[in-house]
């Protein structure tokens, strides 16, 4: 019996897959537990439309992420911090500091976990930092740390 999986089923397939399951397995387990529904022409057509809509939505999200990456590449986030001799900072500049300053300076709101900063910035100067905007879309942002007067 052909069924459309509504949830991931171990050993059978992922959500949205159309699979052949034995009649007994489908009637006694998959259908009553609402893990799958019978694959009729109407339900297959609906599934196809849903997948098309999801693909279009994902493409739009990727396009938005690419536009944002382009915009961020032109941004220079300036952060002032207290520093000692040799340009070493008292404390450090974290991803949270960078995101807050980016929001104040440019009005761009991002999640601090998207900033791919391995370790906090501990010295004066400029640094390019990667930002993961979407799966497969990584932007770069320039962060300049200057000495506070």
From Swiss-Prot:
Function: Binds to the 23S rRNA.
GO MF, any single term: structural constituent of ribosome
Protein name as catalogued: Large ribosomal subunit protein bL9
InterPro entries: Ribosomal_bL9, Ribosomal_bL9/RNase_H1_N, Ribosomal_bL9_bac/chp, Ribosomal_bL9_C, Ribosomal_bL9_C_sf, Ribosomal_bL9_N, Ribosomal_bL9_N_sf
PROSITE patterns: RIBOSOMAL_L9 (PS00651)
Family statement: Belongs to the bacterial ribosomal protein bL9 family.
Gene Ontology biological process: translation
GO cellular component: ribonucleoprotein complex; ribosome
Pfam families reported in the protein's UniProt record: Ribosomal_L9_C, Ribosomal_L9_N
Alphabetic keyword roster: Ribonucleoprotein, Ribosomal protein, RNA-binding, rRNA-binding
